[in-house]
Amino acid sequence: MRKKKNKKTVADTGYKKVDRKEKKKKEKQEEKRRQKKLSVQQSIAYKEMGKDGICRVQGKTYSKCIRFYDINYQLAQNEDKNAIFENWCDFLNYFDASIHFQLSFINYKSSMKEFEQVIRIRPQEDAFDDVRMEYAKMLKQQLAKGNNGLVKSKYITFSIEADNIREAKPKLERIESDILNNFKILGVPAYPLNGVERLQILYETFNPDIMTDFQFDYGSMIRTGLNTKDYVAPTSFVFKDRNTFRMGNTIGAVSYLQILAPELTDKMLAEFLDIDKNLIVNLHVQSVDQMKAIKLVKSKVTDINRMKIEEQKKAVRSGYDMDIIPSDLNTYGGEAKRLLEDLQSRNERMFLVTALFLNTAKTKQALDNAIFQTAGIAQKYNCVLKRLDYQQEEGLMSSVPLGVNHIPMHQYYNMATMINADVHRLFPSIDITMKTRLNSRADFEVTVLAIKTYPMERRVQ
């Protein structure tokens, strides 16, 4: 009897083991099915957005965003211009290798009714009503021949690596304070964005065809059970095409700028931002560690010298003057030595820069026309605007001010490449427009960042 009982127990245990294996197998299959179900919210590349404006973008990456305005540079005295130029150099030199920063220039079309509401002047039924009506008529005429409802805004987003929010918050607040102080020295109005304001930028970027105001407060998340992504997400994302994408009823495309010219002026970026279409220009900038940058340039100088020696050996073997070597070697060699001198003795930094352009439109034809116009400006300055192939999703998420670059294509620049000596367009005279959907205060014309390139290191990875 005991033996039979033992056999039955063994058999029962075997059945239980089989059941457990099948159960685990089914659980794994269900988990795979759940992972395959993609959503719009999963495409939006951040984890959490706090009330104070601190965003956990991915893993250990945290970011904050500052909106900045403009100052009057053209009418300043020469001494003031020199001071602004030097302070702007110090501003860019502030960012070390531990801080990634992103400059965003956003142009979007707002409703003309919204502008008309701002300039509307109601009669007060007094002796000055005639003056008010005449002034209101003048404003409407200026609006009719103005910027067609184009609103321009600009932001700087900076991100750091930290183990948790407790470690990230004091670091981000210190960097924010330093940046605001640098802007104050420059005389540039600036203020940090809170969580709602940052979410509004995402909402307006992902929903350019929706003219309704952004409605959100953190208290509603508790009542509804939704998260912040649910409030900013469009109705759909479609990334099946090679070099375009769709978000809701809008079609868009992300391109990157390949700089081929030996030198650029700030006029190029100014022309990009003068386009009367929806356009977002982003410059992702990462400072290179000083020792690493010097080592890199030294290796380039060594490579150029080795190439010179090889050319001289060829000249001797061929029986002509060894001083006759390709002119490019002399040019690149001189540029490399000057760059090394700047890094070692002039307290300059080297930067990795990615320039991205996001065009959006309602139809494919309108998008092609906008991209053609943008590419024409790039071609005018001997640059190439290239569409991202099969990287439109990464390009879109790199084109919103979150402080993370998902596109690995970049170019090397030193401090002189980030600023042009002709900075009269860096801070142009103030041009007051109407209020934006972000804030009720007056908005100002876009500040233009000048870029001057060196031919020494011009590669796309």
State what each model feature region is.
Residues 422-461:
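Active-site-adjacent "gating/activation" loops or surface patches in catalytic cores
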